[in-house]
Amino acid sequence: DAVAEGATLTVYAGGDIVTVDDAQPGVEALAVKDGRILAVGPRADIEKAHKGAATRRVDLGGKTLLPGFIDAHGHYINSLLVANQAKLYAPPAGPGKDVDSIIAALQAFAAERKIPAGQMIMAYGYDESVMPGGRHLNRDDLDKAFPDNPVRVDHVSMHGGVLNSRAQEYYGISAATETPPGGVIVRKPGTNEPYGLIMETAFLPVFGKSEPMTPEQEIEWSRAGQMLYAEAGVTTAHEGATHIAPFQTMQRATEAGANIIDVVAFPFITDLEKL
């Protein structure tokens, strides 16, 4: 139905509504006002009790309505960056089924964003475990497609990534770079040149060199990052091991009214007194 002007009460019906209440696990209809659930029950009863010109009616069309999900373990602050990167998830979530598909997605992203020569191209979601025939993404693949740009393709775990030559130079990684304890640097066969994934402790210097956001980007990217959660039905995000800088970013975004979901932050023990 059309949304009534100034409507603050919404009735959902026409699909499966899951309550997560053992006494009444499923209902036909649900009424919401100002972000709070007023009533659940049979469709006829709910629509009769909440009728009027100010009521918005939503027909679920046979789809399922679920309560908002709560992220119990995550790193919300990373979503601000991910929202502004090429998405290379493996199917069905994304296009990253093989190297050619990954390169095509990167090229489309760079063209859409009009990224100039010399500017970093960043992506997220690469998963080497799904690459057919063990053919993994490597430095040469990225160099061939992007000879004039540094390219950083972060792993789906966020614990590593693949860099092209220009990105390796930017982050100070070379054949002379030793693999630290607990780290992985995949090297070109027969050489010491970094070639594929850089993971765990070897990736920390890369992860820690992200460009700071401008005040405008903090607001814009906070909304974009939170939309990634909202689109997946997550209404509470979690930021684990929160250091002072990301905490301040979240605080400024909150003060600017940028939040569309709840965010729970757990301060890192070494920064607790500063916060």
Question: Which residue ranges define each predicted feature?
Answer:
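Divalent metal-binding segments
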Residues: 4-13, 18, 22-275
